[in-house]
Each structure stands twice: as C-alpha cells, then as structure tokens.
C-alpha cells in the first residue's frame, strides 16, 4: 500500500485534501499522534470536533485514538462549527482540532488546529513539524502506545457557546426582525437555532426563516461558499419573497457570514467591518479604553480606517491570512478585526473569528433603529468597490 504524501494536504494555515486520495483515517491517526508529540500535549486535554461531512466523524475518532496513544486526554465535541472549536479552546484553555474543509467541495475534508486559548497552529507555529512527524509515523509505524492511554470522552459545548455569544451582544430588546438564514446545509443549521432561536435559550425578537438547515456534507442545494455570488442567489430571492429585513449566509463550517439587505442586495464585508468596528470602539471606550485598536486587511475599503479614526480608534492594516491576523490582534490588543473575505475577529472571542457574533452585531445595529438595512449599510460604504483580481504566479 502506498504511503500518503502529507505535503499534498498540509497548507500554510490548515490541512485540506481529497478524502481517500490525500487524506484518510490512517493519516489522520498519525496526525493525531504527531499533534500531541510536537505540541507537547501528553497528559493534556485535546478537544476534537468536526463538521457535517461524512468523513468527519470517523476522522475525529481516528485522531482521538492517535492522540490517546501518545498520552493526551481526547475529548470528542461531536458536530461543531469552527468557531465552536475556538470557543472551546478558549474556555477550557486546551488545544483542539476540528475536521472541516470549510467551503470546499464535498470530496474534501481537512483539519483546522488550535493551541490552548484558541491560538492558531500554522506553518509558523508547528504545522509543518506536525506534518513531518506524522509522515514518519505513516512510513515507519506509530510509536508504542503509552501505558494506560486515556479513555476518549465526549462533551457538548453548543449551549455554553450560545450563552457566551448572547452575553456579548444583547438582542433581547431590539425591534422585531424577519431574518432569512441560508446555512448552505452546513454547520449554521445547527448553531443558528441554538444562538438566534429558542432551541436552547429564551426566544429573541427574531422571526427566522431557515434555508437549507439540513446538515448534508454533499451540499445538494449549492456550494457552501457565499463568497461566490451565484451561491447567494437563493438567499437573495428568499429575502425578497419573505419581505425580510435581512438575510444571512454562512459558509460550510459557519466561521464566515455574509449579509444581504432587504432589497436582496449583498452588503459589502467592508461595510460590515466598519459597522462592527463602530460598535466595538464605542463599547471599549465605555469601558475606559482610550484608543481602541481595529485590525483591517489590505483589501478592505478605505472607509474602514477613516471611520475608525473618526470614532477615536486606531486602525492597523495587515496582510491577508487568519493566523497572521490573530497574531496581530493579540500583539496590538485589538478589540476587533475584519477581512473583506468576511472573516471577523473579536478580542472577546479569544482573538478568533466568528461569523455568528458578527451577524449578531449587525442584527443589533439594525434592530436598535428604525431604518432599513440598505440605508444603514450605505453609511458604512461610501465608496464604490473595484472588486478583486486573483492572479496565479
């Protein structure tokens, strides 16, 4: 049997490959063992979850077995969004992984890794060392298991995650809003009823119209990548048909959120960045922070730094890349960061990105005033976007 070449699936910030071709259970078991050995996690808790892709559950089990064999205490979190992993790593101060290929097609799966406190594992912080050690284990066999490996346990963090998000943005007193949510058959189909609905907590003044909430890693309706305009069409149509105030679209692992206004038009992520930045600056100033820092990446609209400065904050421009941005968030003590790709980072969320918390800020801003979203969004994006051109070199 040919040994998999892990260089095909290990990227700069995560692991992604085609199931059965560049990633399989044997490889995942070796990666689990290497994760513990490289990061020095013997005797420590390791949190393990995954999305709705068919391979995520067996991959999580295989990773747990590999981690346990090297002395870690694996805890299976079950089906989770990626930001649930970051929450759990922050809350329990433990390292963890989640199996997801985010918005990639159904044939793919992958791994996003974090250290204790939700600090990302990337090529700069051990990811390639994990790859190399795991490659050795695949070629030569796993080391002998530790004596008395820990029992693999289970934990559901959805209720704690939902309660924590609600503690950061109070939606209980906003005006009633009609909200269409397109989960794209991804993990937002699990998290939305818990956070915004009344599945686990008290009801909010939100009338939610669900679109593709059934968890299905084959993505039968459309790819779970709202960055592509074609994948927003169903949501845009539904918002108009329902006469909704707002539409929300999440990607497959629900760490990114895109917004549609009442007319069915997509709202620029730069406008969302500016809107949330204003709210976070005001909150930080109310808590006594003199000049709150806001992170924005290279391709956000210039409206973002202009608004931040006008509101008494300090904008810091960074290059693209979630691991890099999280590091800058921590270094600068930034209260919030936004990317034009609709990744939104919060100091109060362990410097990690969470689409759901960003969505809650938008709902709060909309529901705390009487105007429509299209007019509100125009305040935050006064410039015409030029779009992006991606070139391979």
Indicate residue ranges for each PLM-predicted region.
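Gly/Ser/Thr-rich active-site loops/lids in small-molecule metabolic enzymes
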Residues: 200-205, 210-212, 265-284, 322, ...
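Short glycine-rich phosphate-binding loop at a beta-alpha junction
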Residues: 43-51, 178-180, 292-298, 335
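An N-terminal, well-structured beta->alpha segment
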Residues: 1-63, 69-70, 151-176
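Phosphate-binding and adjacent anionic-ligand microenvironments
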Residues: 246, 286-393
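Gly/Ser/Thr-enriched, mixed-charge loops and adjacent short helices
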Residues: 109-242
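Glycine-rich phosphate-binding loop
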Residues: 94-108, 113, 239-261, 265-266, ...
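N-terminal small/polar loop signature for handling phosphorylated ligands or for N-terminal nucleophile
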Residues: 45-109, 195-260
């Amino acid at each position: 049997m040919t040994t998999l070449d892990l260089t095909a699936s290990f990227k700069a910030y995560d692991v992604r490959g085609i199931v059965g071709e560049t990633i399989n259970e044997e490889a995942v078991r070796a990666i689990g063992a290497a994760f513990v050995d490289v990061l020095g996690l013997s005797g420590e808790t390791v949190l393990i979850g995954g999305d709705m892709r068919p391979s995520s559950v067996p991959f999580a089990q295989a990773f747990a077995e590999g981690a346990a064999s090297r002395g870690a205490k694996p805890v299976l979190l079950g089906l989770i969004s990626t930001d649930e992993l970051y929450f759990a790593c922050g809350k329990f101060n433990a390292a963890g992984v989640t199996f997801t290929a985010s918005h990639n097609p159904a044939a793919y799966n992958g791994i996003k890794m974090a250290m204790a406190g939700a600090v990302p594992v990337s090529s700069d912080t051990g990811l390639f060392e994990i790859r190399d050690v795991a490659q050795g284990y695949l070629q030569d066999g796993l080391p002998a298991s530790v004596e008395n490996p820990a029992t693999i346990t289970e934990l559901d963090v959805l209720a704690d995650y939902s309660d924590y998000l609600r503690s950061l943005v109070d939606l209980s007193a906003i005006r009633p809003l009609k909200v269409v949510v397109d989960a794209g058959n991804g993990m937002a189909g699990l998290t939305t009823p818990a956070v915004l609905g009344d599945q686990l907590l008290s009801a909010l003044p939100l009338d939610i119209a669900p679109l593709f909430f059934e968890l299905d890693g084959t993505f039968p309706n459309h790819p779970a990548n709202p960055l592509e305009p074609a994948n927003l069409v169903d949501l845009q149509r539904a918002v108009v048909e329902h006469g909704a105030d707002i539409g929300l679209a999440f990607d497959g692992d629900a760490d990114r959120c895109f917004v549609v206004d009442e007319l069915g038009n997509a709202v620029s992520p730069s406008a969302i960045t500016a809107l949330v930045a204003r709210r976070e600056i005001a909150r930080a100033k109310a808590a006594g922070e003199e000049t709150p820092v806001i992170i924005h990446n290279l391709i956000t609209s210039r409206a973002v730094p202009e608004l931040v400065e006008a509101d008494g904050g300090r904008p810091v421009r960074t290059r693209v890349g979630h691991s890099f941005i999280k590091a800058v968030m921590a270094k600068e003590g930034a209260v919030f960061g936004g990317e034009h790709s609709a990744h939104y980072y919060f100091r109060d969320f362990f410097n990690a990105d969470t689409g759901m918390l960003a969505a809650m800020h938008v709902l709060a801003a909309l529901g705390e005033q009487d105007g429509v979203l299209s007019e509100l969004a125009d305040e935050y994006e006064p410039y015409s976007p030029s779009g992006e051109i991606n070139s391979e070199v």
